Amino acid sequence: MQARRWMMLGLLAAAAAAQAQAPDWKKIRIGVEGAYPPFSEVDKDGRLKGFEIDLAAAYCAEMKADCTLVQQDFDGLIPALQARKVDVIIASMTITDERKRTIAFSAPYYNSPGRFIGRTDARFDVSVAGLKDKKIGVQRGTTHEKFALDTFKQSKVVSYATQDQVFLDLKSGRLDLTLADMVAVDEGFVKKPDGKGFGFVGPSFTDVKYFGVGMGVGMRKADEKTLAKKFNDAIAALRANGGFKKLNDKYFVYDVSPKN
């Protein structure tokens, strides 16, 4: 009887200790890229701005959390999360089965297919054979990179640290095409003066294996139970109160909300 009593006391103490150690998430460090307009970029004064920057602020307001933005190259965001340099990632990160083996995600907060962009005065046959030996620029660590490498094996897929670097080589003629997020490229390049003479080529790509069900807030698996609910509630609240639509309409002429 005495042994059982001590066992119960030990279990209660362990549970209390675990509860005490669980973060209350009043302070959250958010990993962002800062080089993916119009979702996330740095203005001339060195301040972060964009759709996801505003969205992150709105989520933090809903959660009543004090949030800090931490800028990081896209391919370094998951390592930064695992190294506890950030608590979550808000950086147009697609929810895929492959990524879910490493990290956890919130519900999707926006969605956009992948598309090719090339010169409007050039002709492209968007097929495996048709793009043989063509140079395709992609951002390193993205689903677009993996899709291009797996699908267009006869093409020359060139990876870059940022999408802006891809655009520079596309404009200079060192690349034939880029494969990227349709919304980001439309608003951040095609509609800008720098994108004059460029447009979408071929169909939209939505293969769930690569492009998932949308973009979600990335977090460590160990934090999923406490943190995912907070973000899911904030995502749902912004959809319900019109906050998401207000930001959507500020940046885009089309609806980027996830279709779920």
Region annotations inferred by a language model:
Residues 54-62, 122, 130, 134-135, ...:
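Extended ligand-binding regions for polar small-molecule ligands
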Residues 110-118, 190-232, 254-260:
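Periplasmic-binding protein-like
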Residues 40-44, 56-65, 128, 132, ...:
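Ligand-binding cleft/hinge of the Venus flytrap
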Residues 53, 69-79, 123-124, 158-172, ...:
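Short helix-initiation/N-cap motifs at beta->coil->alpha
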Residues 76, 93-101, 150, 176-211:
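A ligand-binding cleft/hinge motif common to bilobed small-molecule-binding domains
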Residues 21-92, 101, 254:
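Extracytoplasmic small-molecule ligand-binding "clamshell" domains
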Residues 65, 93-95, 99, 106-154, ...:
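A conserved helix-loop-strand patch within extracytoplasmic ligand-binding domains
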Residues 65-66, 83-91, 135, 171-184, ...:
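Alpha-to-beta junction loops
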